[in-house]
Amino acid sequence: MGVRSFRFPDVVLVTGAAGALGSALCDALVAHDVEVIGTDIVQSYVPHPPERKGIFWITADLEQLENRVRLVEEVRSRATGSLGIVHNASFVGSSELEGWSGPIMSQSSETWNRALEVSLTAAFSITRDLTDLLSKRPGSAIVHVSSIYSSLAPDWSLYEGTDLWNPAAYGVAKAGVEQLTRWLATSLAPNVRVNAVAPGGLKRGQPQSFVERYEAKVPLGRMGTETDVVDSILFLLSTQSAYVTGQVLVVDGGYGLA
């Protein structure tokens, strides 16, 4: 049997494209000759300007409904072929927000609502408003970026002696994202595939004490990298996974097996 070629959607929208994972994904998609629409709350991701070949940049705060409406209009005007969406935008544990981290009495309802708006509601509303486009274009696919904390409780011993935290709204939003994945997979079938990736901890300059404790719990002996997650997203976007939908691909080096 010869080597099979695989295809990606013609255009892929990446939210949260300014972060470490989002920017790495944009780079990988461009390398595969995919037209990328990148969006984030900041102007561009470092070190590349918005004019980078293969990437059309839209600055948008997905917490704001009017920004999501504008984003959808831009996607409609540019997506002439099959469409992929990677919902990656999210508040993360290191986000510097008042009422975000710390003990539960320090976590505000306002910030809880903001986190769910960006991580979950924005993913729902953007997909809803592009459903007609997705359904008419064979090869369209959606990938949600979830987390192992959608289904695992945090091990607080990992965080001792550090400024790192694991806010309640983060995991709750990601759990919602995974159920949205399953709901959309059955609702948009057979024309659109919908899957998710659930990364474990990615090594991003955390304190060495945290890294050592975390890696001691990982059967593969290390924290993840952006490349580990990007490769999984590429698989789920492409025709390599043509018979896969409604699934959550856990990319954690076996952390969740412990």
Describe each model-derived feature in a short phrase.
Residues 2-37, 184:
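Canonical Rossmann dinucleotide-binding motif of NAD(H)/NADP(H)-dependent dehydrogenases/reductases
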Residues 105-111, 135, 143-186, 201-202:
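Catalytic loop of short-chain dehydrogenase/reductase
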